[in-house]
Amino acid sequence: MTDRIARVERTTKESSITVELNLDGTGIVDVSTGVPFFDHMLTALGSHASFDLTVHAKGDIEIEAHHTVEDTSIVLGQALGQALGDKKGIRRFGDAFIPMDETLAHASVDVSGRPYCVHTGEPEHLLHAVIGGYPGVPYATVINRHVFESIALNARIALHVRVLYGRDQHHITEAEFKAVARALREAVEPDPRVTGVPSTKGSL
């Protein structure tokens, strides 16, 4: 299997993003987006997926975090898709249940080449909840769905994320990110029993 490494840069009038990703890493993570809670979530994602992940982002956080979070998620998805390459020899499917105190989240991944995202189960108060700030740039949890959609669509994977139950917005969001991390780790792992592309069609 060739090196599964990617580097993607994206610059707009709203942000400048660089993501470096090694799918066969050991969880070495260096994240700086200017949004502390989002840094925390991306660090958890890289660590629990055992990816080596570097994310450097500068955006118009003086307005709010939305553009930076959205654009970083787009570039992360692009890097994931690029690093996957021809997808030969991978497991393709992965899923994980992750508890965090009172919360339980589940994620399921299909590295299918058909982008789709289902995000369900978050309690209604996460539409209005904010984490962090005071001082610093706050993270509005309403963007959680958009993060996962952006990753899935740009990586061209099917990603389902659901919250079975939970109350605390920090615990819910973190459990979601960790569930996605563990599901991705399983899906992209080499399968010694698979030599080609894991599809009856012969391509993904």
Swiss-Prot record:
Biological process GO annotation list? L-histidine biosynthetic process
Top-level division of the source organism's lineage? Bacteria
Keyword field contains Amino-acid biosynthesis? yes
InterPro entries, alphabetized: IGPD_sf, ImidazoleglycerolP_deHydtase, ImidazoleglycerP_deHydtase_CS, Ribosomal_Su5_D2-typ_SF
Q: Where is the signal peptide?
A: none
**Gene Ontology CC:** cytoplasm
Tell me its EC number(s), please. Answer: 4.2.1.19
Q: In which pathway does it act?
A: Amino-acid biosynthesis; L-histidine biosynthesis; L-histidine from 5-phospho-alpha-D-ribose 1-diphosphate: step 6/9
* Class of the enzyme per the UniProt entry, highest EC level: lyase
What are the UniProt keywords, alphabetically?
Amino-acid biosynthesis, Cytoplasm, Histidine biosynthesis, Lyase
Write down the chemical reaction(s) this protein catalyses: D-erythro-1-(imidazol-4-yl)glycerol 3-phosphate = 3-(imidazol-4-yl)-2-oxopropyl phosphate + H2O
Classification via Pfam families: IGPD
Where does this protein chiefly localize? cytoplasm
* UniProt subcellular location: Cytoplasm
Q: Which GO terms describe its molecular function?
A: imidazoleglycerol-phosphate dehydratase activity
Membership in a protein family: Belongs to the imidazoleglycerol-phosphate dehydratase family.
Protein name listed in UniProt = Imidazoleglycerol-phosphate dehydratase
Organism, per UniProt?
Rhodococcus opacus (strain B4)
Q: Per UniProt, what is the name of the gene that codes for the protein in this document?
A: hisB
